[in-house]
A protein has these predicted regions:
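Tryptophan-rich aromatic "cage" segments
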Residues: 384-412
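Paired acidic/hydrophobic, glycine-rich loop segments that form the ligand-binding mouth/hinge
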Residues: 88, 132-141, 273, 290-298, ...
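A ligand-binding cleft/hinge motif common to bilobed small-molecule-binding domains
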Residues: 145-150, 292-312
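Periplasmic-binding protein-like
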Residues: 167-169, 180-183, 262-266, 308-334
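Extracytoplasmic ligand-binding site segments that recognize negatively charged/polar headgroups
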Residues: 89-100, 112-126, 134-285
């Protein structure tokens, strides 16, 4: 019994001594074992957002963000044959002859080429795209300011440049140019040995009041866009004024620069409006005329001079410029029902066989390998004496310019 009491006493003493020494450090809790299985398993990948029908069409046809630099033409032609048809909206009557050439080369692919005129190509394209009922495959028209201000921003057409194309970058952006239409300052060659003006400001002088013929810019957006080229190049117009008069132009309250001042004075000088290009030529260049006129006319009408039906010559060398170029474009309609046939048509129409109906004196192609007819300027030469229509500027200023022109037309 005494032994048991001694054991109890010893245990109590040990406990008391431990208490006097302070609390023993607490062991850190053990970390839970890592779940190596869950770490090894990858998190489920997020699903890519589904493509819209338009995006699927673009991806399938390698257009837009899916464009490639090269094309497999054998595969494209085979796919085009399966599509069986291509529908082209053009603004030239020569599309009929081009369609004949196409039929000889691609008899298995029916071509429907429509000469709609520039305004109708635009309205038909916009109407189809907005309704979602797409019929057309190829845009083959100018479009002017509407191209950059409406058609391209709304993705109604898509850029396509065949890898067979021989064009400089400036002729393939924002779309591939098919040809250039040159409007030139011209004079009656029976009544003048040379151009009677050397500076574009001279056409605003009293001598030429009511003596300048032009396609009506109030009813033709293309003509008004060409006049806006002179407004856009305000610095060059200012320098031309200084070269002619020896001092800087005095601006009016409604003319912020020399470009707008020229347009105002041009309108005030009462140019004679005509409904179309043929009427312009008849009004200033009919053989046997006795009244002297100047005009803005199409250089592509020069074959009529060579055949003796008209009498005019271009005013090459006028300061600061002799004319304005209107761009004609090729593009594939958004969600075209026959996209491969559309690609094949664009490749064809920029080839020698395809462009043949337009390969006449006065028409320029952006292909540097094209040999121009004898006596005609080359594309490099004509680009030095003409301006391109500034399409974005024209889009932003067409309404204002039309009102401005009308307000000043024929005013003293």
């Amino acid at each position: 019994m005494k032994t048991f009491a001694k054991v109890i006493t010893l245990v109590i003493l040990i406990s008391l001594l431990a208490g006097c020494g302070g609390a023993a450090p607490t062991a850190a809790p053990e970390q839970p074992a890592a779940n190596t299985e869950s770490q090894a398993a990858e998190a489920p990948a997020e699903e890519a957002p589904a493509l819209s029908p338009k995006e699927e069409w673009l991806k399938a046809n390698q257009l837009g963000p899916y464009t490639t630099d090269t094309q497999d033409w054998a595969a494209i032609e085979e796919a085009a044959k399966k599509e069986g048809k291509v529908v082209v909206y053009a603004n030239s009557s020569k599309i009929a002859k081009a369609a004949e050439n196409w039929a000889e080369k691609y008899p298995d692919i029916v071509i429907e080429g429509y000469d709609l005129g520039g305004d109708d190509v635009l309205s038909k394209t916009v109407g189809e795209q907005q309704s979602g009922t797409i019929v057309g495959d190829v845009w083959f028209s100018s479009g002017g300011a509407e191209i950059v201000g409406n058609v391209l921003p709304n993705e109604y057409v898509w850029r396509f440049v065949p890898d067979t194309a021989s064009v400089a970058p400036e002729f393939s952006d924002p779309l591939l140019m098919s040809r250039l239409g040159t409007t030139i300052l011209a004079y009656n060659s029976e009544l003048n040995e040379a151009c009677p003006v050397t500076n574009i400001w001279e056409v605003t002088q009293p001598e030429w009041k009511g003596k300048f013929v032009i396609e009506d810019p109030l009813n033709d957006a293309s003509t008004l866009s060409k006049l806006l080229a002179f407004v856009y190049h305000a610095d060059e117009m200012k320098q031309a004024y200084v070269d002619l008069y020896g001092s800087e132009p005095v601006l009016d309250a409604d003319t912020p620069d020399a470009g707008w001042l020229w347009l105002k004075r041009f309108a005030q000088n009462g140019p004679i409006p005509q409904p179309g290009g043929d009427e312009v030529d008849s009004a200033f260049a009919t053989p046997g005329m006795t009244e002297n006129y100047l005009a803005f006319t199409s250089y592509s009408n020069y074959p009529d001079v060579q055949e003796g039906n008209l009498a005019f010559e271009p005013c090459w060398g006028v300061e600061p410029i002799s004319g304005v170029q209107a761009q004609s474009y090729l593009a594939i309609m958004n969600q075209a029902p026959h996209p491969n046939a559309a690609k094949l048509f664009i490749k064809f129409i920029i080839s020698e066989d395809g462009r043949d109906p337009w390969a006449k004196f006065g028409t320029f192609f952006p292909d540097p390998t094209y040999v121009v007819p004898e006596g005609m300027l080359t594309i490099d030469e004509v680009m030095k004496v003409t301006w391109l229509i500034p399409e974005q500027f024209a889009y932003e200023n067409l309404v204002q310019a039309r009102d401005f022109y009308l307000l000043n037309l024929g005013k003293p």
